[in-house]
Amino acid sequence: MSSPKSLAAVPTYNDGMPYPEMFVAPMRQELTDLGVRELRTPADVDAAVTGTAGTLMIVVNSVCGCAAGKARPGIALALRNHVKPAVVATVFAGADVEATDRARHYFAGYRPSSPSIALMRDGKVVYMLERSQIENRDALSIASELTAAFEKFCAAPITT
C-alpha cells in the first residue's frame, strides 16, 4: 500500500521529474515579458525575500488552464496600475521545484497552491491570492483585486 502524498507535493511530470523546459518556456515568457524576475533557485528566492525594500510580489506560475487564462492575464493587467510592488518575481511550480518549495516556505499558514500570488513585506505575507480564489474568476476580476491590494500594501508604509 502506498503512502498518501504530502500536501506540499507540487505537480510534476513523468513520475516526479520537472516539466521539460521547452514545455514551460512560453508560460515563463508571458511573465518575464512584463518585467517579472524569475527566481529559479532557493538562493534566488531568499535573496528576493530578504533583499527587497518595499513590497515584493511572488507569483507561483503553473501550467494549468487557470494560470494561462486567468492568473497571468490578470497579472499583466494589474501591472499597468501606477501603484505596484517594488519587485515582482516568479517561481514555476512543477519546473523550478526547489525554488517553489522555498517560496512556499515563506508563505507559512497558506496551503501550497498554483497558481498563487503573494505580496510580502519584510519577509512576511501581507496578502495572498490562492488558486481557489483564481480558478472561478476572470482576468479582469483578478486584476481588480490585485490593484486594490497594490493600493493598500504598496502605496505607503504599512503600520500595525
Predicted regions and their residues:
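N-terminal leader/targeting and pre-domain segments
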Residues: S2-G54, C154-I158
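Short active-site neighborhood of thiol/selenol oxidoreductases, capturing the structured segment around
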Residues: T52-C64
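Thiol-based oxidoreductase modules, predominantly thioredoxin-like and allied folds used
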Residues: V60, V83-R102
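Typically the conserved alpha-helix immediately C-terminal to a functionally engaged Cys/Sec
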Residues: A68-N81
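Short, charge-rich binding segments
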Residues: R80-H82, F107-R111, A118
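Short acidic (Asp/Glu) patches
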Residues: V97-S114
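Non-catalytic, surface beta->alpha helical segment in thiol-disulfide oxidoreductase systems
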Residues: R111-I158
